[in-house]
């Protein structure tokens, strides 16, 4: 089981490039950058984990900028959006961002995507149909795949529609970077099986259940859909610093766990990263 590390990159947190270097040096396989464009002051949508919304949600940098810096300062570590809010982004421009980052990183990008939870934030981007947002996500992903894989690309859906176009660069990874779909079981799992190359559930939200218990059913669902479960690896966010729990996830079939660290300077982040690296080493014994 691989270990990744995530942070809301802000102007008061550890630099994204230095963060990625430190993670690469300590054996983490991936760095992840979340996304929120802004937080409306009139927000009514509840924070999924309860309580007050941490200020870093309104203050994080654009994930593609952070990951480009991380790419420039590292050689092997993978670079993921954790997650990109596709409902708030133009698919043509986002397809170019993804392909460009995959090229400058020499094929290290992981395209984590999600539907989001903040209805007011989405509405400011013109996405007012909160309940129907996943249909928009799917069409935008399908449209981006067309742009990445076709010399002359076009897409005609009910929500996304464009005629033949030339769009380069194409991604370094072929046919494209893995699209890793976020969401709880069973709906997120079904979406990952339908159009993803990975699934990202969350481990610290008890209302969504125990991911480890769902994995046999997830694998069965994948096979019934004609897909090899190995082609849809599970990346789990929201994990405890508990060796027994990590063993449980590993033995259940989780491919990667991602550690979320606070938005803080290097003198606070590096020691925490060291502790997680030690847990990773102990797990491998």
Say what each PLM segment does.
Residues 1-285:
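Active-site-adjacent structural elements that line small-molecule/cofactor binding pockets in enzymes
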